Curated annotation (Swiss-Prot):
Its EC number is 2.7.8.7. It comes from Yersinia enterocolitica serotype O:8 / biotype 1B (strain NCTC 13174 / 8081). The gene is acpS. GO terms for cellular component: cytoplasm. It comes from the Bacteria. Its cofactor is Mg(2+). Belongs to the P-Pant transferase superfamily. AcpS family. Transfers the 4'-phosphopantetheine moiety from coenzyme A to a Ser of acyl-carrier-protein. Its main location: cytoplasm. It catalyses: apo-[ACP] + CoA = holo-[ACP] + adenosine 3',5'-bisphosphate + H(+). This is Holo-[acyl-carrier-protein] synthase. Keywords: Cytoplasm, Fatty acid biosynthesis, Fatty acid metabolism, Lipid biosynthesis, Lipid metabolism, Magnesium, Metal-binding, Transferase. The lineage of its organism: Bacteria, Pseudomonadati, Pseudomonadota, Gammaproteobacteria, Enterobacterales. One of its GO terms (molecular function) is holo-[acyl-carrier-protein] synthase activity.
Length: 126
């Protein structure tokens, strides 16, 4: 296997909070998959949840080398956790097509947050 992409993003959680205060749930609906939306609505700290998901999706877009454009959208990257809570990505629509075109075999996600920041790194292997 070879690393074919690496992306990192850091988000100031208060920035996400300000956007949600200003525009309601518009940001969350644009970023989250339907399953993530359900978790967001029930989460004890929804702003922190949203900030972490945003960081992962930005990192994924960077790792793929595309950014969010040309048919690629935030909600096509879905953060899911295994039985131990380890995050990974489930890809949908154009994101899944792009992964197939690139020969992606594995996606690795690491996620961290502190009081003010959420940070994520995504590694793509072929």
């Amino acid at each position: 296997m070879a690393i074919i992409g690496l992306g990192t993003d850091i988000v100031e959680i208060s920035r996400i909070e300000a956007v949600v205060e200003r525009s309601g749930e518009k940001l969350a609906r644009r970023i989250l998959s339907p399953a993530e939306w359900q978790h967001y609505q029930q989460h004890q700290q929804p702003i922190r949840f949203l900030a972490k998901r945003f960081a992962v999706k930005e990192a994924a877009a960077k790792a793929f080398g595309t950014g969010i454009r040309n048919g690629l959208a935030f909600n096509q990257f879905e953060v899911v956790n295994d039985a131990l809570g380890k995050p990974t990505l489930r890809l949908h629509q154009r994101a899944a097509e792009l992964a197939a075109e690139l020969g992606v075999k594995s996606l690795h996600v690491t996620l961290a947050d502190e009081r003010r920041y959420a940070c994520a790194t995504v590694i793509i292997e072929s």
